[in-house]
Amino acid sequence: VLFGIPYFGLSFVAQALVARGYESLGIALSAFAALAIFYLLGVARFRALRYRLSRTRWRGIRGGSDTAGFLFGLSYMWKTAVGWIPAGLLLPWSMTSLWNERWSKMSFGPYAFEADAEAGNVFARYLLFYLTPFVLFAGGIIMAGMGMLAGYGVGGEEGRALGGMIGIFALVPFFYFGLGLIAVAFFAKFYREVVGATRWRDLNFTFTASTLDWVKLLVVDALLVVFTFGIGLVFLSYRHWKFF
């Protein structure tokens, strides 16, 4: 509500300006609205973590941050943009850098957190996820060609068309499930890296969930929602909190 209403309000004003002939002003206002939402997303991520720490108590001691997160919003903007500029290849750096910056501004009691996660430790998993669509696309072409040849040998021209379609459709499940599994493998490695690189004074944190653990979590989430006709959504936050 806080983001949506102002954004759609500015978008409506921008469209009205364009309709009245003020194209440049309307485009500028639309760009400003998009950048404002982008900035506020970064601030919101910072404040969400600060809020959770402020509600975490241990023997009367609680966490938080001395900063409001406004500068982090700017860091979120430029680091995310830089991560996407070279065809998305710097996204692991962007994600680890933002994690380090966000946690390094947090504290629990009188002691600050420290985080020094390195993107190089997760880049191999990310590169696997990044290149998989291209490999699957090439595999789809090969399978379609093989299906066309097999179909042509059985049913001529009609068989060739049918064989090509079968070859392509046979690759669709591998594309969705394979790409999804690799994405889960990347995030499993990412969280093991960033949590393991986070410290609080002399206390080092670890996160040992494997890719299989993540798959089990997501599959059970889906089954819980489907077989309870959506009622299970209310239990997902508890499951995720327990998982982490």
Regions found by a protein language model. Give the residues of each.
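Alpha-helical membrane-embedded segments
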Residues: A36-L40, W84-L89, V172-F186, L224-L236
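Membrane-helix interface segments in multi-pass membrane proteins
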Residues: Y7-I37, L136-A183, S237, W241-F244
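Transmembrane-helix bundle segments that line or gate the permeation/cavity pathway
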Residues: V1-K105
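Interfacial aromatic "cap" segments that immediately flank transmembrane helices
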Residues: V1-I5, I61-G83, Y111-A138, F190-I231
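Juxtamembrane interface at the ends
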Residues: R45-L53, P92-A112, I182-D202, S237-F244
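Hydrophobic alpha-helical segments embedded in or immediately adjacent to the lipid bilayer
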Residues: P86, L90-S107, L127, T132-G151, ...
